[in-house]
């Protein structure tokens, strides 16, 4: 199963880096739920995931995710990503700063029948907000 999951994660990374709706429907179950820090309620299905990507791309039109490492157990994956992009649009109400970001994210996925059915997304929003100048550097 771990080779299958690795292939699915590769498809997922291609999906998030392109926001391709066809790939969304291939890799994301319509019954999927996504827990993200920017929404009080879980997002659902491919449409929910596309809305997350839309929010990110509205603030960082060139954003790209690099999958750094995974830990796979049965049908579950812990994944560490690096997100990079330029803050060239409004993000969470913060106007474009023109600053580049490089932010870590740790996400947890569950797969069923070759598709994502659950994700807990944990991007380092504190670091992101500091990097775009919305918060002062700490320390």
Name each region found by the language model:
Residues 1-139:
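C-terminal and inter-domain tail/linker signature
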């Amino acid at each position: 199963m771990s080779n299958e999951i690795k292939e699915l994660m590769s498809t997922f990374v291609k999906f998030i880096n392109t926001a391709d709706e066809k790939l969304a429907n291939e890799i994301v179950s319509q019954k999927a739920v996504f827990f993200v820090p920017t929404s009080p309620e879980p997002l659902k299905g491919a449409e929910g995931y596309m809305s997350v990507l839309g929010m990110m791309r509205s603030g960082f039109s060139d954003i790209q995710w690099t999958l750094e490492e995974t830990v796979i157990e049965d049908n579950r994956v812990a994944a560490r990503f690096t997100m990079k992009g330029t803050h060239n649009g409004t993000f969470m109400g913060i106007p474009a700063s023109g600053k580049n970001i490089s932010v870590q994210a740790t996400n947890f996925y569950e797969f069923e029948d070759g598709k994502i059915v659950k994700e807990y997304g944990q991007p380092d929003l504190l670091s992101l907000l500091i990097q775009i100048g919305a918060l002062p550097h700490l320390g």
